[in-house]
């Protein structure tokens, strides 16, 4: 090997060439993460390719050894896996990292909600929200996220505090993370004209064309959905719902959302998050709901880590259910399904770091997304990108040279370890970003340096 070529010999040895033009030799990629086919795939859905990077773009992807790249610098990947950057379609960066200040006393959903409401009223000033959002985004960026959608608590005075903060963050992170946001409030608030006037004003000024609400079985659910859909139609907005985050099989608002979309022939994207109770319904009822979801064209996002933490929790009793939706049945019906981070170090989930590699690893374990493994790779990349209307989540010729390089050579190596030594590549260059130190948040919690 000549001196201009790099080798992958240790966790700290992978170094991309300083030149703007180089080749990644014998790189293992999942066929489902490529923009176009490039050679044969093995039983797990992987293929070996060479990738030519030219001034921040992917100039060529070809079967390994098919092209002579000449004397340009090379990285000998030796069958290590490259992934597209992640897309995290369901997060809550406005409430992230408040655990030190406000814990969930018993770990269930009701206590989480009460704790967040108390902390929001007492502490969520613009500087507080901004600091926690920034910390969250720095974490996501360091881990290899290209795009992120957050839900923003939008009730009372908080609406006018948090949305301008989000808009400033979105502008500050432009070109690094593509940010979107959806308002979060219970469906009953749609019936309050004053509340909805505030929501419309904030989304007009600071939003990203997405309207949302939390749906559950309340007496005026149909009226609330009718008004919400009508506003979205008038404004040309997409919809993003929190749906049936419950262990009650009678929680069936997902069917109501799907039926409303079909009835109104709603033409914009709709995403439904959680949908936990679907997994606990009788087979006939579940099938009817899934058929409606597929017919309406809804996307469904499961939040495996948070839902496993909250659902079926009773003090002193072992959980009988993992808390997640019927994701396999939805996928089999043709529904675009995806997984995302959800809450991070707050009363709804005291763990997590907006690391989609962790979300993927845990999602595979919790949801059995491994037979076949390759079929589920788009759930953390291409499918959430499509749900956000973005041309991201795949490796393609002509696209940006944005990817994650790992030392893993198959799916068991990829998921057995946290890939802490991954190399995040953005525009052809290795990113130097690292997750921020938790001590940076100490001032928010009155902790001495």
Where are these regions (language model features)?
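Di-metal (Zn2+ and/or Mg2+/Mn2+) metal-binding site signature of metallo-dependent hydrolases
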Residues: 80-101, 246-247
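His/Asp/Glu-enriched, well-ordered alpha-helical/loop segment
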Residues: 238, 259-270, 310, 321-406
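Alpha-helical scaffold segments that flank or form the walls of functional sites
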Residues: 80, 99-151, 157-172, 198-204
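Active-site gating loops and adjacent loop-to-helix segments of metal-dependent hydrolytic enzymes
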Residues: 96-129, 207, 235, 253-271, ...
């Amino acid at each position: 090997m000549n001196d201009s070529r790099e080798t992958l010999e240790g966790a700290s040895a992978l170094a991309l060439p300083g030149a703007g033009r180089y080749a990644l030799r014998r790189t293992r990629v999942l066929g489902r993460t490529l923009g176009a086919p490039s050679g044969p795939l093995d039983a797990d859905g992987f293929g070996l390719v060479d990738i030519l990077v030219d001034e921040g773009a992917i100039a060529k992807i070809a079967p390994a050894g098919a092209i002579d790249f000449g004397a340009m610098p090379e990285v000998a990947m030796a069958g290590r896996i490259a992934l597209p950057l992640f897309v995290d379609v369901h997060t809550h960066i406005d409430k992230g990292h408040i655990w030190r200040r406000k814990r969930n006393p018993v770990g269930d959903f009701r206590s989480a909600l009460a704790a967040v409401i108390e902390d929001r009223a007492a502490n969520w000033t613009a500087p507080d929200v901004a600091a926690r959002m920034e910390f969250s985004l720095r974490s996501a960026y360091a881990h290899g996220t290209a795009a992120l959608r957050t839900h923003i608590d939008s009730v009372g005075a908080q609406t006018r505090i948090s949305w301008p903060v989000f808009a400033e963050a979105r502008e500050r992170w432009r070109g690094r993370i593509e940010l979107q946001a959806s308002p979060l409030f219970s469906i009953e608030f749609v019936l309050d004209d004053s509340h909805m006037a505030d929501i419309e004003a904030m989304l007009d000024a600071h939003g990203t064309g997405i309207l949302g609400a939390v749906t559950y079985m309340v007496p005026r659910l149909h009226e609330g959905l009718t008004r919400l859909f009508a506003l979205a139609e008038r404004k040309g907005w997409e919809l993003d719902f929190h749906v049936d985050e419950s262990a009650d099989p009678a929680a069936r608002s997902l069917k109501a959302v799907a039926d409303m979309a079909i009835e109104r022939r709603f033409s914009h994207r709709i995403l439904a998050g959680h949908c936990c109770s679907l997994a606990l319904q009788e087979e006939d009822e579940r099938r009817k709901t899934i058929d409606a979801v597929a017919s309406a064209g809804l996307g469904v996002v499961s939040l495996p880590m948070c839902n496993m933490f909250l659902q079926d929790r009773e003090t002193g009793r072992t959980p009988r259910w993992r808390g997640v939706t019927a994701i396999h049945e939805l996928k089999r019906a043709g529904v675009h399904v995806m997984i995302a981070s959800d809450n991070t170090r707050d009363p709804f989930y005291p763990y997590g770091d907006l690391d989609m590699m962790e979300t993927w690893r845990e999602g595979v374990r919790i949801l059995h997304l491994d037979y076949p493994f390759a079929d589920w790779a788009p759930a953390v990349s291409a499918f959430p990108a499509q749900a956000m209307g973005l041309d991201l989540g795949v490796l393609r010729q002509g696209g940006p040279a944005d990817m994650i390089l790992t030392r893993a050579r198959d799916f068991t190596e990829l998921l057995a370890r946290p890939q802490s030594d991954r190399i995040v590549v953005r525009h052809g260059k290795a990113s130097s970003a690292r997750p921020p130190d938790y001590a940076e948040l100490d001032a928010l919690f009155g902790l001495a340096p």
